[in-house]
Regions:
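Bacterial N-terminal signal peptides
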Residues: 1-13
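Processing junctions and N-termini across compartments
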Residues: 10, 40-43
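Bacterial Sec-dependent signal peptides at the C-terminal "C-region" and cleavage site
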Residues: 11-21
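A short beta-strand-turn-helix
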Residues: 19-37, 64
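Loop/turn elements at helix/coil->beta-strand transitions in domains of secreted/extracellular proteins
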Residues: 34-37, 67-71, 99-105, 134-136, ...
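Conserved S/T- and glycine-rich ATP-binding loop of Class I adenylate-forming
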Residues: 38, 46, 170
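C-terminal cap of thioredoxin/glutaredoxin-like
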Residues: 41, 127-200
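Structural alpha/beta surface segment adjacent to cysteine/selenocysteine redox centers
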Residues: 42-129, 200
Length: 200
């Protein structure tokens, strides 16, 4: 595994745990058939999730997913003790249905401005700063679709089945093996791991 550098690392069988892993519609970076797949369960109001996304996942998207070496799947896992995280998850889910780029813009802004909207609940205004007027209208039109909440519930149920108890938790599948990791992993550490699995 990754030794003491990680909070938790449990080897799992390489499962279908992600039929979703092969679903292009859920891949927010990289190709569905990339040699490595990272599935992240995250909460927009979680400070550790903010750090992990901005300092680790964003570089992974830029350096690995853009070259189709890694497929990144993001799962919404809003925690009950976070008052506004469910609303943020709904906006992000709707944005992904509009397009991956819109999802990235919304996710970036929600995490960058987390301290503000977590306090005052201004999720809508935060999302509005991330999107063009046209894209914002498309996202808002989707919010009333029951499928948005249903998708979040599926993510929550999937996470619970896979042993997710806190955020961020992510799963890496490479070379036929899946590992579960809980907590923040620095990009420099994750990069070494990815390179070792890619034979670089």
């Amino acid at each position: 595994c990754w030794g003491a550098l990680l909070l938790v690392c449990a080897a799992l069988p390489a499962l279908a745990q992600s039929n979703a892993r092969g679903d292009a519609g859920l891949c927010v970076g990289g190709a569905p058939n990339a040699p490595i797949k990272i599935e992240v369960f995250s909460d927009f109001q979680c400070p550790a999730c903010r750090t992990f996304y901005l300092e680790t996942i964003r570089p992974v998207l830029a350096d690995y997913a853009s070259a189709n070496k890694v497929c990144v799947v993001y799962r919404e896992f809003p925690l009950r003790n976070h008052q506004h995280s469910r609303k943020a998850a709904r906006y992000a889910t709707a944005a992904r249905r509009v397009g991956v780029w819109q999802w990235v813009q919304v996710t970036d802004r929600l995490y960058l401005d987390q301290s503000r909207w977590s306090q005052d609940g201004t999720v809508e205004a935060t999302v509005a700063r991330a999107l063009s007027k046209e894209d914002l209208k498309r996202v808002e039109a989707l919010l009333g679709d029951s499928a948005i909440n249903a998708e979040i519930e599926r993510d929550l149920a999937l996470g619970r089945r896979q042993g997710v108890r806190s955020t961020p938790t992510f799963f890496i599948t490479a070379q036929g093996k899946t590992e579960r990791v809980t907590g923040i992993v620095q990009y420099s550490i994750l990069r070494r791991y990815l390179d070792s699995r890619l034979g670089q």
